[in-house]
Amino acid sequence: HLVGYSKKIKKEISFKELKKKLFFSSMKKSAIPYVTNYYNNDWGFCLSKKTFDSLSKTKKYKINIDAKFSKSSLKVAEATLKGKTNKTFIFDTYICHPSMANNELSGPLCMLLIYNMLRKIKNKQFTYKFIISSETIGPISYLDYLKNNKQIKNIYGAAILTCVGMNKKIFFKSSKNEKHFFNKLMRKSINKKFVELRFDPSNGSNDRQYSSPG
């Protein structure tokens, strides 16, 4: 598996040089980790520990990564359920980590369930927007789009759906504004034990963007 954002390269190298570019999990020897290398001029491969251990230490390895970086535009998927008011609530998730079930597929599936549930409700008070894009850069661009189109004033709140596919306790990360109604709603509506995390801009997902000033 190629490390995300790897550059184009074609060369022959020794195992000593190659192993610096290989990523694996020593704890889960059959698992292949997901690694990205955003904005660095580098390359690499992800593999299982078992595969790594089977590699010859004396052979030469031919590396041929036929990759290219091309100018394009960021794609954002948006679906809207109109309510009686323009007061808008956003459900956000991302699809920028290929081949990952919990971190990637669970968010859009959960969003689809919420969409179908809200779609059946007549005379909705709020307008709901469902956003699917790339993590971090996606909501930054989308919020800028809303600002430029004078829609940012209508946003009342946002919920980020990520890593919701495991049969474990629900983790709920509160918004920066502790008194926001959504925090109170979540605490009352979750019908089983959950872990509440305080907002922390130094880590997390798209909550860093939706709860940040500006």
Each language-model region and where it sits:
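N-terminal hydrophobic/helix-forming segments and targeting peptides
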Residues: 1-209, 214
